[in-house]
């Protein structure tokens, strides 16, 4: 019974399962904060104190484990975390033997990842989970908490308001909580808070004040939290600050504070109530001018004036002016009430502690002593107001000076000298008026050159304007204007100034103020003067002619300017005429006239000037410009301008006032300076006979863009001799040759490759063409009158040409190559011509082949210079008969020749190359062989396919009853080619000692059976289930059929010439067959039936185990008290090893159940 109990206990323990649990995720924490992650294990065996290993998988490498910290190994941490572990920034706290906390202080962005808690195995076997993972995301700390630092003094019983800005910009869904606290003597007291669940919670010390409404917390806008305290008490003083916390809800539903910050504090002092008060009277100054404004302020110095009742009365020379109730409502007496109605006096309350008296438009009689009296009132029991205490400050004396003007007047003119007929403008500026109520009147007067006084115009204080007797007509026609800009500027404008308008102008300004009786009172008068002179039109009239280009070249332009002085306005009539005297002599004549009305009139002898000249007059510059373009000899000479000044009379007729002539201007017109430059480089050219030679004649610079050139080509034969003309291209771009170049005429080409680039090409150079060649360039230009003239001539440098026969330069690719191919495939061998002597040379090729065992190379194919392919006769006894017929020659590209062998055989292996001959044509047209070259060798290797035949080595081990049957499979796992054919042979190695293998069946590649042995006749059957799977069916087996069966497979391939050859073969033992004689017993019956076998030998054991566990549990519940882990007589229970079941591999023996005792540790 004790053994059964121990077995039941062992089975029960084996059912225990270890389970590791970790804090649910994902978790989100703010950067810079800390985190604690719990991990526990249960269902384990072994010591009660389990170890915990913490690792992380970073997002950048999710498959790579990085060890952080462990409880059992100080060196567990990787280098990236070892410093933080040593400094205590990361550590593990063991809560109990099977529970631990991972603490990380000062979280960093790189701490984001998947954390794994792992518990090393202490169980007898691995069963259950040993680790758990949780994701941690470190997010930025975006919480901001701010409140202005300030110092506030309050009176007991008053109120206080402070605000705090709390906001966050997190990407996760978070909540905010805000708390107001008071710090006094180092101890913080909570005033009121709004939690992360949006509920308002007062602190314990302020719960009573909150219940009666003396503590409020309001949210203003999106992020402003306002604290309001009413009925302040001295105990409320201290540093008041706010504290903001950002919360996030973890997956387990708990709220976790991500981060917490506090603001600057507001220092609050609450003073005890003081009922005393003082009064102070202030004013800006004590001396005023009549019409000014005086302000007096009565200031009350008291605690909490807004909560107290003060009444104020104002007095002048001890006489009451006005009184004000505590609410600020005024009550005025007598004359002062009327002045208030007229807007001359105002009594007001500026704030709780400041009362004011304002007197507008002071009068001299307002001089005297002013004072205010302040009376504090309190409400009696029945609500009536009772005067408690009255106070008044010292008197303030004020002096009001009589009215007098302080005007300043300034006169300015647009010019001290004005041209006759130009507008005359004068401005009279007024400054320092007595006040906003004052008005001014202005008048203009003139004293002419003869000393006579004239009244020009005036404007009274109401803005009415009238002119003097001599100026009324001009005022009516708009020739006279008096303009007022604002209140301080009077402008006088006279259109069409006359000589009588010259003189001294005076502006007189008078200032007026309203008198108390409603009339206007003159304060004073001020004046200023300015002198203006009117200049006659012809005064200073002068004409000057200038030019910046006295010397010009053909086709250039030149400008002549006629400058008029002084600058006359557009209404003054001025006519200008340009005169011209040719350089070759002759009379001076008028070219063009610019009339006073703006018209242009050309002279009778203007000639070519009309088509290439422009006359312009500038209104702003007072100049008349004559512009001449495309200058030629016809425009060379002397120029002069004559100007006439005209004035329109009152009758409307024009009268000529003056005429002025300018200085003479001489213009010289020259031909352009030759700038022709031809390249003078001397060089030597060595050319191959028959090749073309190109000589260039380069014009580096030319005199003008429209120049034309005649190019003459000359040759010196021999060098140094006189040059002979062989070709010419004239200015009309016509090409030709000359008698000196008659022999070259058929081979000479003249051309222009680009502007300024001339070329002479000599085709098919011969040795007698050697010599020194050069060009001579003539530059022709067209003058402005469309006539051509030769401008310049230049000769180029010599080019010595030496004609020689061509150098042999045939080059073939000499790089050796290896080509490998399977039998039957095609092989291509290339022959690459890298270079040749001349581009137009011709090539002949011969393909050669050398095989091992042969002394000489043999030709395969020939290609003549005409591109004709010649075949090579097959030689008797050739190792590779029919090879020429399988050869194909092609030219894929220029210079690349290819030899292709079709249907290759093993005996086609060898070394291949090509022999190339280059043929050139001499100048007479005959072809001759210049050189020959052999290419690099190409080593061709033709081989049969690699044998890859392989059989599946699976071995079948079966027992068959006599008279039964069995099947053997021969599986080909791989073959060399899919088009190969297979032959199969089956054989038997009997069980008797020394027996020879016996062939059962031979099937050739065509599926034909070989004759069978007599004992197998009619018994065998071969099936081909797939191209690579063959099955042999053997019925009616007998004892002699026992033994090892072997399968031999041969792989045959079709050769290039159509004959089959054996490529590979493989043999494998595919089965061990044991034939048993017929007998009937229980063992054979059970083994022959799978269901009966499991019923007898498998199912009883689980049922037996469940029964033992049930008995063991019942025993444990009713066991007597004793030492744990002991059975009867104190024998330990847990010492039985697992039962061992021994099975026969062939099912010939029944299973044996044995229980072996173990040892007690």
From Swiss-Prot:
Disulfide bonds: 39-117, 164-242, 298-372, 428-507, 562-641, 697-775, 831-914, 970-1047
Topological domain ranges for the Cytoplasmic compartment: 1113-1161
PROSITE patterns from the UniProt entry: IG_LIKE
Motif (EWI motif): 246-248
One cellular component term from this protein's GO annotations in UniProt: membrane
Entry keywords, A to Z: Disulfide bond, Immunoglobulin domain, Membrane, Repeat, Signal, Transmembrane, Transmembrane helix
Species name: Xenopus tropicalis (Western clawed frog)
Residues exposed to the Extracellular side: 17-1091
UniProt-listed SUPFAM superfamilies: Immunoglobulin
Residues spanning the membrane: 1092-1112
Protein name: Immunoglobulin superfamily member 3
Principal location listed in the UniProt entry: membrane
Membrane topology recorded in Swiss-Prot or TrEMBL: Single-pass type I membrane protein
Ig-like C2-type domain sequence ranges: 18-135, 140-258, 272-382, 402-523, 541-651, 674-796, 806-930, 947-1063
Lineage: Eukaryota, Metazoa, Chordata, Craniata, Vertebrata
Gene this chain is encoded by: igsf3
Subcellular location: Membrane
Pfam families listed in its UniProt record: V-set (PF07686)
Signal peptide coordinates: 1-16
């Amino acid at each position: 019974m004790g053994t059964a109990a121990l077995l039941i206990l062992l089975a029960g323990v084996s059912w225990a399962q270890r389970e590791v649990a970790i804090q649910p995720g994902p978790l989100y924490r703010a950067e810079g904060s800390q985190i604690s992650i719990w991990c526990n294990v249960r269902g384990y065996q072994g010591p009660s104190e389990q170890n915990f290993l913490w690792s992380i998988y970073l997002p950048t490498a999710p498959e790579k484990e990085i060890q952080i910290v462990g409880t059992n190994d100080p060196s567990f941490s990787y280098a990236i975390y070892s410093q933080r572990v040593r400094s205590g920034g990361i550590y593990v706290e063991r809560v109990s033997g099977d529970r631990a906390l991972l603490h990380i202080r000062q979280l960093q962005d790189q701490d984001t990842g998947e954390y794994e808690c792992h518990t090393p195995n202490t169980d007898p076997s691995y069963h259950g989970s040993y680790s758990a993972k949780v994701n941690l995301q470190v997010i930025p700390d975006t919480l901001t908490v701010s409140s202005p630092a300030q110092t506030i003094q309050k009176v007991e019983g008053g109120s206080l308001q402070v605000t705090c800005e709390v906001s966050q910009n997190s990407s996760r869904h978070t909540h905010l909580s805000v708390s107001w606290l008071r710090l006094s003597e180092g101890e913080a007291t909570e005033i009121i808070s709004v939690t992360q669940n949006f509920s308002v919670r007062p602190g314990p010390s302020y719960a009573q004040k909150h219940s009666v409404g003396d503590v409020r917390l309001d949210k203003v806008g999106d992020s402003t939290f306002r604290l309001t305290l009413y009925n302040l008490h001295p105990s409320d003083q201290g540093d008041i600050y706010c504290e903001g916390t950002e919360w996030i809800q973890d997956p387990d539903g708990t709220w976790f504070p991500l981060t917490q910050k506090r603001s600057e504090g507001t220092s609050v002092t609450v003073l005890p109530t003081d009922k005393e008060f003082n009064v102070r009277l202030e004013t800006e100054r004590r001396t005023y001018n009549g019409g000014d404004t005086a302000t007096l302020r009565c200031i009350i110095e008291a605690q909490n004036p807004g909560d107290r009742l003060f009444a104020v009365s104002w007095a002048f020379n001890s006489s009451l002016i006005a009184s004000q109730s505590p609410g600020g409502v005024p009550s005025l007496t007598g004359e002062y009430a009327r002045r208030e109605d007229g807007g001359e006096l105002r009594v007001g309350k500026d704030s709780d502690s400041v009362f004011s008296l304002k007197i507008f438009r002071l009068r001299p009689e307002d001089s005297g002593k002013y004072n205010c009296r302040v009376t504090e009132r309190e409400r009696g029991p029945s609500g009536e107001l009772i005067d408690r205490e009255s106070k008044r400050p010292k008197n303030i004396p004020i002096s009001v000076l009589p009215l007098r003007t302080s005007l300043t007047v300034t006169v300015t003119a647009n010019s001290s000298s004005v041209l006759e007929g130009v507008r005359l403008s004068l401005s009279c500026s007024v400054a320092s008026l007595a006040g906003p109520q004052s008005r001014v009147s202005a008048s203009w007067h003139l004293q002419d050159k003869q000393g006579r006084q004239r009244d020009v115009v005036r404007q009274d204080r109401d803005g009415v304007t009238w002119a003097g007797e001599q100026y009324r007509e001009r005022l009516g026609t708009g020739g006279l204007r008096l303009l007022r800009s604002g209140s301080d500027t009077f402008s006088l404008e006279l259109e069409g100034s006359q000589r009588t308008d010259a003189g001294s102008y005076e502006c007189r300004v008078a200032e007026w103020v309203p008198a108390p009786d409603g009339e206007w009172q003159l304060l004073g008068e001020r004046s200023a003067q300015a002198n203006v002179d009117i200049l006659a039109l012809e005064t200073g009239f002068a004409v000057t002619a200038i030019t910046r280009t006295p010397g010009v070249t053909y086709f250039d332009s030149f400008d002549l300017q006629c400058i008029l002085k002084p600058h006359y306005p557009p209404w003054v009539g001025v006519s200008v005429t340009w005169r011209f005297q040719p350089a070759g002599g002759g009379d001076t004549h008028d070219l063009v006239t610019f009339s006073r009305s703006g018209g242009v009139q050309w002279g009778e002898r203007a000639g070519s000037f009309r088509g290439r000249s422009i006359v312009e007059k500038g209104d702003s510059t007072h100049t008349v410009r004559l512009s001449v373009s495309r200058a030629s000899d016809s425009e060379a000479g002397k120029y002069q301008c004559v100007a006439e000044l005209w004035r329109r009379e009152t009758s409307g007729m024009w009268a000529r006032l003056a005429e002025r002539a300018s200085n003479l201007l001489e213009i010289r017109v020259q031909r352009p300076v030759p700038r022709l430059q031809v390249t003078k480089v001397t060089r030597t050219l060595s050319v191959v006979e028959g090749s073309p030679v190109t000589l260039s004649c380069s014009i580096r610079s030319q005199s003008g863009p429209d120049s034309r050139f005649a190019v003459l080509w000359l040759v010196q034969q021999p060098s140094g001799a006189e040059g002979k003309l062989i070709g010419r291209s004239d200015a009309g771009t016509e090409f030709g040759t000359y008698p000196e170049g008659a022999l070259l005429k058929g081979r000479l080409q003249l051309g222009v490759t680009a502007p300024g680039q001339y070329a002479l090409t000599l085709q098919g150079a011969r040795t007698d063409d050697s010599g020194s060649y050069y060009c001579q360039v003539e530059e022709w230009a067209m003058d402005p009158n469309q006539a051509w003239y030769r401008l310049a001539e230049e000769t180029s440098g010599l080019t010595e040409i030496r004609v020689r026969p061509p150098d042999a330069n045939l080059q073939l690719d000499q790089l050796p190559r290896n080509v490998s191919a399977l039998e039957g495939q095609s092989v291509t061998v290339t022959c690459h011509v890298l270079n040749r002597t001349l581009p137009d040379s011709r090539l002949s090729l011969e393909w050669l082949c050398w095989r091992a065992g042969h002394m000489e190379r043999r030709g395969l194919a020939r290609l003549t210079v005409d591109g004709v392919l010649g075949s090579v006769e097959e030689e008797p006894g050739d190792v590779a008969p029919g090879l020429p017929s399988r050869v194909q020659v092609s030219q894929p590209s220029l210079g690349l020749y290819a030899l292709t062998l079709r249907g290759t055989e093993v005996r086609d292996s060898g070394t291949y190359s090509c022999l190339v001959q280059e043929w050139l044509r001499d100048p007479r047209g005959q072809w001759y062989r210049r050189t020959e070259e052999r290419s690099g060798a190409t080593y061709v290797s033709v081989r049969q396919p690699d044998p890859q035949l392989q059989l599946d080595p699976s071995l079948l081990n079966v027992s068959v009853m006599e008279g039964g049957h069995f099947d053997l499979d021969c599986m080909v796992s791989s073959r060399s080619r899919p088009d190969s054919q297979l032959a199969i042979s089956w054989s038997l190695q009997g069980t008797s000692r020394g027996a020879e293998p016996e062939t059962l069946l031979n099937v050739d590649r065509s599926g034909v059976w070989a004759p069978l042995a007599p004992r197998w006749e009619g018994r065998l059957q071969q099936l081909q289930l797939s191209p690579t799977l063959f099955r042999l069916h053997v019925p009616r087996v007998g004892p002699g059929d026992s033994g090892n069966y072997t399968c031999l497979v041969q792989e045959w391939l079709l050769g290039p010439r159509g004959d089959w050859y054996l490529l590979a073969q493989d043999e494998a033992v595919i089965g061990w067959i044991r034939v048993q004689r017929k007998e009937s017993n229980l063992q054979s019956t059970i083994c022959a039936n799978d269901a009966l076998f499991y019923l007898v030998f498998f199912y009883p054991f689980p049922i037996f185990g469940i029964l033992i566990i049930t008995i063991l549990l019942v025993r444990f519940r009713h066991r007597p008290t004793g030492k744990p882990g002991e059975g009867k007589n104190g024998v330990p229970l847990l010492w039985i090893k697992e039962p061992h079941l021994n099975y026969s591999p062939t099912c010939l023996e029944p299973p044996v159940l044995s229980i072996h005792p173990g040892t007690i540790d």
